[in-house]
């Protein structure tokens, strides 16, 4: 069974599986069906449920340890300490890190220390180059894969891992799986071409990238 739900849809499905005796080991969720709110209320009843994971979780990464040490241990945390390092918390950290790195990347081209415009930050977002060495230096070891973005590729990565709920926390697998771009790229191109045509947009040229 593939869960494609959002919010309470997932925990409801897992509770029904428990009630009917359907093996949770045979249930797989898309990445947005694989966070703590989806399984926490079901607890042991969701044990064995699998879900795709775009990012790691847990309190082991250095970036998470720094937040615990410099924020929560000093009594300056504004949210529950036990949520630090959860799937959604970590995803939020990644988003903020990418935003900062986009500004940093833009400043490399347009002037270090200067205030960047929206267009300049867009260039930074479209020219990210985060290799493993950089991710480790930022404290995001084992959190995400290296990524490189471009004007034509805003995603930068099409890889994910599979995580399994053990009744209390997520156990993430070591193997990464890549989406089949031979299937996805034509679909993305067709969708973007239609959107551009419907909205009467002009295609960006290389100079704008």
Regions found by a protein language model. Give the residues of each.
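Segments of small-molecule ligand-sensing domains
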Residues: 78-89, 100-174
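Catalytic-loop motifs flanking and including active-site residues across diverse enzymes
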Residues: 6-9, 63, 91-99, 158, ...
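Active-site proximal loops enriched in glycine and acidic residues that flank catalytic Cys/His/Asp
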Residues: 5, 29-33, 53, 164-166, ...
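Hydrophobic alpha-helical
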Residues: 1-20, 95-102
């Amino acid at each position: 069974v593939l869960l494609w739900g959002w919010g309470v849809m997932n925990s409801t499905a897992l509770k029904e599986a428990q009630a009917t005796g359907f093996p949770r080991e045979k249930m797989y969720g898309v990445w947005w069906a694989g966070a703590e709110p989806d399984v926490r209320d079901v607890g042991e009843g969701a044990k064995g449920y699998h879900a795709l994971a775009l990012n790691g979780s847990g309190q082991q990464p250095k970036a998470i340890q720094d937040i615990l040490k410099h924020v929560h241990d000093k009594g300056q945390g504004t949210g529950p300490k036990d949520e630090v390092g959860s799937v959604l918390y970590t995803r939020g950290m990644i988003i903020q890190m990418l935003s900062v790195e986009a500004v940093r990347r833009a400043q490399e081209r347009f002037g270090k220390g200067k205030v960047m415009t929206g267009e300049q930050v867009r260039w930074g977002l479209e020219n990210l180059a985060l290799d493993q060495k950089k991710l480790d230096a930022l404290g995001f070891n084992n959190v995400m894969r290296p990524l490189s973005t471009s004007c034509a590729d805003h995603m930068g990565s099409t890889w994910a891992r599979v995580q399994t709920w053990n009744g209390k926390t997520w156990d993430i697998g070591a193997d990464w799986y890549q989406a089949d771009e031979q299937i996805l790229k034509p679909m993305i191109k067709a969708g973007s071409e239609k959107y551009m045509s419907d909205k009467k947009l002009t295609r960006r040229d290389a100079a704008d990238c």
